[in-house]
Regions:
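Functionally constrained cores in energy, signaling, and assembly domains
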Residues: 21-22, 42-43, 48, 52, ...
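Rossmann-like adenosine-cofactor binding region
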Residues: 66-134, 139-141
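Adenosine-phosphate binding glycine-rich loop
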Residues: 1-16, 113-184
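Glycine-rich phosphate/diphosphate-binding loop of Rossmann-like nucleotide-binding domains
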Residues: 1-89
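Generic structural signal for well-ordered, non-membrane alpha-helical segments
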Residues: 24, 28, 71-74, 78-81, ...
């Protein structure tokens, strides 16, 4: 929902953006999977993790879920794939996104640095090099907190009320669209 609304504010088309994520665990891959279903082309998604860029032929720290996003590239590090990125989605570790990398992102970049307790980059670090960036973190003491607490209780309440035994992708997408609409 936050990325959908951020793209509206930035005047960007979801089908044309380049997304770079730092983190390839369950949270990151679930987010990326949903963003692809919402309209970001899979070929525009660049996933990085502790071993670097998820690329075709990589064996270190790979699994079938990551392999879906493997790119044909010689790039091996986050700093090599961040150029012209419209969206950075951080679900990894503090300090991995550097100000010099932010400088190389596309105009009006969306930077969601969600690692806790230390985000991938702080709002102050972003603002020191870009005044056109939209930044959110997972912390309540910084502006623009992004927190999954907005959706979990209500998805479960809706599932219980409907007698559902599974949370489906359709339910997740409905939650995304509803939260995006409410947060505009």
């Amino acid at each position: 929902a936050a990325i959908m609304n951020g793209l509206k504010v930035a005047g960007k088309d979801m089908s044309k953006v380049k997304l770079v994520t730092s983190g390839a665990g369950a949270a990151a891959l679930a987010c990326v999977g949903l963003l692809v279903k919402l309209g970001i082309p899979r070929e525009n998604v660049w996933v990085t993790d502790l071993a670097g860029v998820v690329y075709e032929g990589r064996v270190e720290l790979m699994d079938p879920d990551k392999s879906i996003y493997a790119q044909k590239t010689d790039a091996r590090k986050l700093g090599e794939v961040i150029d012209n990125a419209d969206v950075f989605l951080g679900l990894s570790a503090g300090g991995v996104l550097k100000a010099e990398m932010v400088k190389r992102m596309a105009p009006n970049p969306i930077i969601f640095a969600l690692a806790n307790p230390t985000p991938e980059i702080t709002p102050g670090e972003v603002k020191s090099v870009r005044d056109d960036a939209i930044i959110g973190t997972g912390r309540s003491d910084y502006p623009n907190q992004i927190n999954n607490i907005l959706c979990f209780p209500y998805i479960f309440r809706g599932a219980l009320d409907a007698g559902a035994t599974t949370i489906t992708v359709e339910m997740e997408m409905a939650a995304v669209h509803t939260i995006a609409e409410l947060a505009q």
